[in-house]
Amino acid sequence: MNRYLLTVAFILSALFTNGQTISHDNVQQILSDILTAQKALQGAVILSDMKGNDIASADCRMTKRGPKACKQDFMNIAAEKSKQFSYDGCRLDYVGLESLDIAAKGATVRANRKRHYWGSLTAYYPAENPQYRIFVIMEQNIYNGTYYGVPLCAPVVARIIKSLNN
């Protein structure tokens, strides 16, 4: 599995749970990647609007366990922008999420072999005061149809959330 995809999942997990993270077999390498990325991003703009206006910067304190604390306004902005993108940026009716109040971000990574991909979707449910963090990753060959993260993983996320509501 792609180490960078795990790193992104780890960062998202830590950011949206006030530093509480899941453990990984190679956690030392992942933490090293996070610390390296954070040093490179210190003070850099990491969120801007469609007009190019700066919205938030990388202003997190890091520890060996990951992000210790981030500005609350960044957390709120990130959650709101994620929710807005989820509704405005893709066809939620197409992927089965139209009636669910979620904040989600998808990713697609090409594996080492040609035409071989990992698609993922990280979702927080409900978007306001999330109670659940769901991370779905699926391996797909481009010859088998859809391989982008959102359309590949969203039906699984939808089934998980619907089962939580029953």
Q: What is each PLM-predicted segment?
A:
Residues M1-Y4:
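Positively charged n-region of N-terminal signal peptides that target proteins for export
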Residues K68-N166:
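Active-site beta-strand/loop architecture of penicillin-binding DD-peptidases
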